[in-house]
Design a protein with these regions (language model features):
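Shared catalytic-loop signature of beta/alpha-barrel
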Residues: 1-68, 72
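Extended hydrophobic packing segments that form well-structured cores
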Residues: 69-98
Length: 98
């Protein structure tokens, strides 16, 4: 829809590396991509939750070349920080709240 109206898009990398990987992949495939926006480079927990962290170089994200979204979840880390309906589960600090 945006492309047909000559509008550019700027996906936000705000919800962790799996959502970010989806936005990175779509950004490499569309002609009206402008910029990826992120508040960080997915260090700490967001790097640990992937078997191979997303790479950044000079402020640019390097699109993964592995199949699918290009990322593989580290299930041990994910299970150690399992979601529960009582606590906020966002990374805006060193470790997610759980």
């Amino acid at each position: 829809m945006a492309e047909s109206h000559y509008a550019q898009i700027a996906p936000h990398l705000y919800c962790g590396p799996v959502e970010g990987a989806a936005n990175i992949q779509i950004s490499t495939c569309i002609p009206n991509f402008l910029i990826l926006e992120s508040i960080g480079r997915w260090k700490g927990f967001h790097a640990q939750i992937l078997k191979k962290p997303v790479e950044w170089e000079s402020g640019f994200v390097i699109p993964p070349t592995e199949p699918g979204l290009g990322v593989e979840l580290n299930e041990e880390v994910a299970l150690a920080h399992a979601y529960n309906e009582k606590d906020l589960h966002l990374e805006m600090a060193e470790k997610p709240f759980y």
